[in-house]
Amino acid sequence: MIRHVKTIALLILASGLLAPLAQAQDMDVIQRMKDREEIEHLMWRYTRALDTFDPDAYVAVYTEDGAFGQVKGHDALYKMIADLRASREQRAAEGNPPPEMFHATENYWTEFVTKDHARHHAYWVTYYGANGPDAPARMIQVGRSVDDLVRVNGQWLIQSRNVAPQD
């Protein structure tokens, strides 16, 4: 009888000691799920900013020293998107409006390097929208990306974006 009481007491003690550990693990899982959702939203904002040629929204998803390939830093990233927008507006003014552009990201996976550093892997497709009711949308480019993301002041941002990794 005493042996059973000791066993029961040890089980109760162990469950009391393990409960905080289980709660901590649950909190880690919840945080990781929240991080994944925030990263998914970050990448949606990136795509939307690119497809609407919005330089302010585009630089807002990058760290101050963020890079898209060889284009590095907010000023250079802003100029890249502003120049694309100006070129499109110029073509439209000349009577040759370019079709709308759409990017789709598929089969993405987020790898957590540390709690504040993630690597986002994805396949992407670029489409040109129809220029008029009789013109079909066209797939113009496909590829794969590997992006390094970091948490800065509680917010996930793109540190570097590589849309043509060599591996």
Predicted regions and their residues:
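Bacterial N-terminal signal peptides that target proteins for export
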Residues: 1-10
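Beta-strand elements of well-folded, non-transmembrane domains
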Residues: 126-130, 149
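Short beta-strand edge/turn micro-motifs at domain boundaries
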Residues: 117-121, 140-167
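Short, low-complexity N-terminal intrinsically disordered segments enriched in polar/charged residues
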Residues: 23-52, 56-64, 75
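A solvent-exposed, acidic/Ser-Thr-rich amphipathic alpha-helical stretch
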Residues: 55-125
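Transmembrane beta-barrel outer-membrane domains
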Residues: 37, 99-101, 138-140
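C-terminal segment of classical bacterial N-terminal signal peptides
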Residues: 15-23
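Short structured motifs
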Residues: 43, 104-108, 144-145
